């Protein structure tokens, strides 16, 4: 069996049902095949989604690549390319690694009972990654979302404190209004003082002229009383010739 990489092709994107025989039937029309092999998983024995074919001449290999690359085989679009040469004895494992890197290893996309992905290293269950582990979320009591809620709660508290600050500001203005009210009271008391002065009930006491008007005259009689016919003399009346009038 020839291992010459010059005549060896890499076949990727194979269906799970494609077998060695099916691979040979698809490519033997382009030339004599030395080998047709679907690579299997060493643990499960299932197809890994890629394989190799080896021709005995370069012309057949080139024709197969040109004709079959991008064609349909067993319901799958396959890729056909020249296999990489052996380096350091890596052999077919090196080609297999290249197939996995190019997305031809179907084990990654094979359903595993979850949303896809490998096994979680936290709980050991398949179908999710460690960062999406449901056991981790339940242990944290909601995970990162609960901390997010707490952050918004603290934000609400901050705005509540802001409202309190504005409430205190309103109280300050209320106190200012009280100050002006007391000022108005002061002016009111001042007005009362002047009102008392005008109304006769002030600190200056009763009107002197009123006392004189309501008191006795110098002649001993009350003004307006019987016998009080004489005019009371005003304090500033000047004597005229012939006496007071």
Curated annotation (Swiss-Prot):
A single Gene Ontology CC term: cytosol
Residues annotated as domain RRM: 7-85
Residues bearing PTM N-acetylserine: 2
Matching InterPro entries: Nucleotide-bd_a/b_plait_sf, RBD_domain_sf, RNA-bind/splicing_reg, RRM2_NsCP33-like, RRM_dom, Znf_CCHC, Znf_CCHC_sf
GO BP annotations listed: response to cold
SMART domains: RRM, ZnF_C2HC
Expression across tissues: Expressed in roots, leaves, stems and flowers.
Composition bias, Basic and acidic residues: 92-110, 129-196, 205-221, 228-245
Protein name: Glycine-rich RNA-binding protein RZ1A
Species this chain originates from: Arabidopsis thaliana (Mouse-ear cress)
Lineage: Eukaryota, Viridiplantae, Streptophyta, Embryophyta, Tracheophyta
